[in-house]
Amino acid sequence: MLLAIDCGNTNTVFSIWDGEKFLCTLRTSTHHARTADAYFTWYSTLIKHYGIETDITDVIISSTVPRVVFNLRVFADRFFGCRPLVVGKPDCLLPVQPRVDAGTAVGPDRLVNAAAAYDRHGGNKIVVDFGTATTFDVVDDDGAYVGGVIAPGVNLSLEALHMAAAALPHVDIAKPQAVIGTNTVACMQSGVFWGYVGLVKEICARIKGERDRDMQVIATGGLAALFQQSEILFDIFEDDLTMHGLTVIHRHNKENGTV
């Protein structure tokens, strides 16, 4: 069985796979100081609660938070007796190497999304991931990651408004009833929601124009569904894209004898 771990700035997600069969997902908030023992206590408690029988033999990790990788490595080694693959490290092979400026460090989550998009849908794609940051990743015809765009995330933008302007409250993102808000909360929600609709449309249009071709747009991430239900912005919606990408990269390494 494979344990795939996606550690982002906000949440850490564990996904368990038996071959190609998905079994379950466990989610917790990301804490920089969480120990290997604490990970195991949380993990084993939930596995027991849900009545899931597991026999983990392999672990793969993608983390945008470098500080947590060490303890996740210890967790995998101590409790499952395996050396985990860590996306972005030299010993973790990618199906296709990224084509970006020499010396550029590409976020592992972006490499994982590119691998998943190509495996499921082929090349010539734009992947929009609504996470702590909103990222746009361009996947070439052969599956290579060739660059993209990083914009502030939706919730990050709302939080910045609240933190920087004393009179503005903390609000949650939602589709407003109208563009013109009649109270402060509605005005903030309208600005962020419709602002991001415009941002996605404009950036995707400019990427297509720069590459001089039409491209399918794939959406993933926690808030993608909100925008997909409200506006026709995407051709494909994949809520499990990143986790699928981790299984793709693990399979590639398995086939090449690195695990």
Curated annotation (Swiss-Prot):
Pathway(s) of this molecule: Cofactor biosynthesis; coenzyme A biosynthesis; CoA from (R)-pantothenate: step 1/5
Residues annotated to bind ATP: D6, C7, G8, N9, T10, N11, T12, V13, T132
SUPFAM superfamilies: Actin-like ATPase domain
Main subcellular localisation: cytoplasm
Alphabetical keyword list: ATP-binding, Coenzyme A biosynthesis, Cytoplasm, Kinase, Metal-binding, Nucleotide-binding, Potassium, Transferase
Known catalytic reactions: (R)-pantothenate + ATP = (R)-4'-phosphopantothenate + ADP + H(+)
EC top class, as a word: transferase
Residues at the active site: D109 (proton acceptor)
Note describing how the cofactor binds: A monovalent cation. Ammonium or potassium.
Cofactors that this protein relies on: NH4(+); K(+)
Binding, substrate: G107, P108, D109, R110, T184
ATP-binding among keywords: yes
Example GO BP: coenzyme A biosynthetic process
Gene3D superfamilies reported for this sequence: 3.30.420.40
Quaternary structure note: Homodimer.
Protein name: Type III pantothenate kinase
Species this protein is from: Ruegeria pomeroyi (strain ATCC 700808 / DSM 15171 / DSS-3) (Silicibacter pomeroyi)
Taxonomic lineage: Bacteria, Pseudomonadati, Pseudomonadota, Alphaproteobacteria, Rhodobacterales
